[in-house]
UniProtKB/Swiss-Prot annotation:
This is Methionine adenosyltransferase 2 subunit beta. Pathway: Amino-acid biosynthesis; S-adenosyl-L-methionine biosynthesis; S-adenosyl-L-methionine from L-methionine: step 1/1. The gene is mat2b. It comes from Xenopus tropicalis (Western clawed frog). Regulatory subunit of S-adenosylmethionine synthetase 2, an enzyme that catalyzes the formation of S-adenosylmethionine from methionine and ATP. Regulates MAT2A catalytic activity by changing its kinetic properties, increasing its affinity for L-methionine. Can bind NADP (in vitro). GO terms for cellular component: methionine adenosyltransferase complex.
């Protein structure tokens, strides 16, 4: 069912100005996006918006003026918002995703990644909303890839543990919810440090200084536009099929180390890469990370859900605004 509300506009004509009232149709399908100010959340918000959904995006520190301010740790505020908006779907993108920050702020990370997710699951169930909880490949230890949805999790760090606890809390409190595990993400960042992939670009551009790049951990960089499309496809399939629930995996299919990512970035922009040095030793002293947490995505592929953008295409779209050499940017894109 679609709702209607009034909108006003000013009409100008020679010698005359008038205020005109129009009936505006509001799409009947309502989506609530948490973490809508973040890298993935922005992409999900845009994907649903462009596909005729009435979308309410929520954020915290960067919420105003575009998005609704919402403290996910305020259970009463979460309940009030969901009861008022009555979404058909909630895409839960908000999380503390940085492993090093989780290690240094464990209590806050647990509140956001676990407790807030549990509360959201309960409220979603209360209004009959389909909830997609975005999780991580870090729930696995990376020793026996590829990992299926029913593979036994064994997170190596606190971030992975909080995401796994969040999964279990969501599925325990909302049997109709879905968990979508994804790997490291990149996309249209507001600053290079917003993604563990795009932050590498400065190492590529400043070729006057050699840079040691990790060539040990195996990653599958995934474009946020692809994940957003999968969220939309899952949601629209769920509207027709209530069996769409439980755990799913989605990932890019190009296996790359950080060294290989930076070489691909250099290739995408025709930049030198000889200053980049591969380091094959396992990092020492850092927060433990899985060697190869590759996700098996066949469960979604078998039901015709998925979208993949080649890394060199997606990374070029994401990084060209940050090119130091503006001449190249003008030549290629204008």
């Amino acid at each position: 069912m679609e709702g209607r509300h009034k909108e006003y506009r000013i009409r100008f004509s020679p010698g005359w100005v008038e205020v005109v009232q129009d009936d505006v149709t509001i799409p009947g399908r309502r989506a609530l996006i948490t973490g809508a100010t973040g890298l993935l959340g922005r992409a999900v918000y845009k994907e649903f918006k462009e596909n005729s959904w009435h979308v309410l995006g929520c954020g915290y520190s960067r919420a105003r003026p575009r998005f609704e301010y919402l403290n996910l740790l305020d259970a009463a505020a979460v309940k009030a918002l969901i009861q008022d908006f009555k979404p058909h779907v909630i895409i839960h993108c908000a999380a503390e995703r940085r492993p090093d920050i989780v290690e240094s702020q464990p209590e806050f990370a647990s509140l956001l990644n676990v407790v807030a997710s549990e509360n959201l699951a309960k409220e979603a169930a209360g209004v009959g909303a389909f909830l997609i909880y975005v999780s991580s490949d870090y729930v696995f230890d990376g020793t026996s890839p590829p990992y299926r949805e029913d593979s036994v999790p064994n997170p190596l760090n606190l971030y992975g543990k909080t995401k796994l606890e969040g999964e279990r809390a969501v599925l325990h409190n909302n049997e109709g919810a879905a968990v979508l595990r994804v790997p490291v993400l990149y996309g249209d960042v507001e600053k290079l440090s917003e993604s563990a992939v795009t932050i590498l670009f400065d190492k590529v551009q400043f070729s006057n200084k050699s840079a040691n790049m990790d060539h040990w951990q195996q990653r599958f960089p995934t474009y946020v536009k692809d994940v957003a499309s999968v969220c939309l496809q899952l949601t629209e399939r769920r509207l027709q099929d209530p069996s769409i629930k439980g755990i799913y995996h989605w990932s890019g299919n190009e296996q790359m180390t950080k060294y290989e990512m930076t070489c691909a970035m250099a290739d995408a922009f025709n930049l030198p890469s000889s200053h980049l040095r591969p380091i094959t030793d396992e990092p020492v002293g850092a927060t433990p990370r899985p060697w190869n947490p590759q996700l098996d995505c066949s469960k979604l592929e078998k039901i015709g859900i998925g979208q993949r953008t080649p890394f060199r295409v997606g990374i070029r779209e994401s990084l060209w605004p940050f090119l130091v050499d503006k001449r190249w940017r003008q030549t290629v894109f204008h």
